[in-house]
């Protein structure tokens, strides 16, 4: 969600 390894 927050573009940290696609979370």
Curated annotation (Swiss-Prot):
Coiled coil: none annotated. The keyword Plastid does not apply. Expressed in the CNS but not in the ring gland, midgut, thoracic perisymapthetic organs (tPSO) or abdominal perisymapthetic organs (aPSO) (at protein level). It comes from the Eukaryota. GO terms for cellular component: extracellular region. It is found in: Secreted. One of its GO terms (biological process) is neuropeptide signaling pathway. Keywords: Amidation, Neuropeptide, Secreted. The keyword Secreted applies. The modification Phenylalanine amide is found at residue 7. Belongs to the FARP (FMRFamide related peptide) family. This is FMRFamide-like neuropeptide GQDFMRF-amide.
